Amino acid sequence: MYTYTVNGTAPCAADQSTVTVNETSSPNAGTDGAITTCSTSAPSNLFTALTGAQAGGTWTAPGGAAHSGTLDPSTDAAGIYVYTLNATAPCVSDQSQVTVTINTPPNAGTDGSVTVCDVGAPTALFGELTGAQAGGTWTAPGGGAFSG
């Protein structure tokens, strides 16, 4: 409590007033973070990507819709998720963000089989797989490299 005093001139007495100061802590939404996950990974808590954040805030998804804070990479979108901690006046609210990257799992295709003659022409094995994405590597029986 702070006291303000004005001295009076005799015969008047001094006069005092007081001011009580109530301090409110400002919110801390933490330091921004990032999560990189696979679309087939288990759900994870966005809060764990923030450093030093206070609990009790709210999450919004990319586009601004409310979000639970539990990222399900099979259904949620990649992008920026915002964590907001509201403040009590005169403090201002604080925000942090988690940048989410969701990768698609690799697809080596569906297993296949082929019968070849031991003296026949070379066979391109990649064509024996169904739905395989390009860019993989082949390994021969015994572990050696193979061009496919």
Pin down the residues of each PLM region.
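Proline- and Ser/Thr-rich low-complexity, intrinsically disordered segments
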Residues: 1-148
